[in-house]
């Protein structure tokens, strides 16, 4: 909902009631939002009454949206505001095959909206009307002071209704017009977790269809979750069960394996991501192959043509061009040069319990399997670190460095056996 009205006003007013503190905390730091408290909740008109003292009276129009109708599009909101330049009062309406329970839109012979009639008050002829009110509207700000002051709660629910403003507008000779949304899901409301789940599936399918229309290959468009913005280049392929959060950019020719989770990450062209990978706040250079079961944490940067294999974790580290980290390895707070091979089981020991330290590995270095690099430490260009080494001091360039206990064979030793 807030995404739909982004840019329409410098400051948006959010009316909160139930769990108000939690809602405000969720949007903490948003300088474009202000909050009005509605306690108790006494109808839609009452909600606007609470917002009225903090609304900008200099704005010619006031767009009223509903928090439980989350999928209003920016295009529909824009068309409503454009229509408001011709008609002061604009309703968002929709035609339904079965409008039972909804307020009907009554028009005169010229097609001008004259009233909203609730079903219980409608005549038999009015009940045949299929155009109904969604509750979303654009109102003339200059008239709101008088209209809100005139609202009454003399109904069975003792609530103040925004729909009563239509009658005030008609009495004042204000022209009322209506705009239809492009899609019915834009005005679907949510009153239960069942409805929320159903609408979420609708929205995910809408996003999946947009990707398909743009040329993205989705192995199963019903099994993808986009929880933010996903930007795809040409010839992208996404397997089943993938989740994209925040802003994710996939370059041309990227393939994403099944059940991968990618958050706030940029992936350049021709990258293959094998199944069950997890990326967050990372940057992946072109022609790389990652996974399966790889994790890129915030600050991980792969510069290109990198291999990051199974059960490898990279955090706050730069991996140079053509370097490989293929198996069972942790690279944290490190600068790894170009054409480096990091053997299985290598760990950059970057944390002493209080502080984090960096590891620097020069170009063309070879790190043997099961090496511990005790940071801060540097490995020179072209250096070789023998398997099983615990490196506590800098390793010189172009030389073999290793530390391991001398191998021994104990003559005459026998393995203990259990007593019978």
Q: What spans do the regions from the language model cover?
A:
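Conserved core of the sugar-phosphate nucleotidyltransferase
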Residues: 21, 25, 31, 72-156, ...
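Acidic, glycine-rich loop-and-beta core segments that form the ion-binding/anion-interacting portion
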Residues: 223-304
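Residue-level signal for inorganic ion chemistry
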Residues: 51, 68, 80, 105, ...
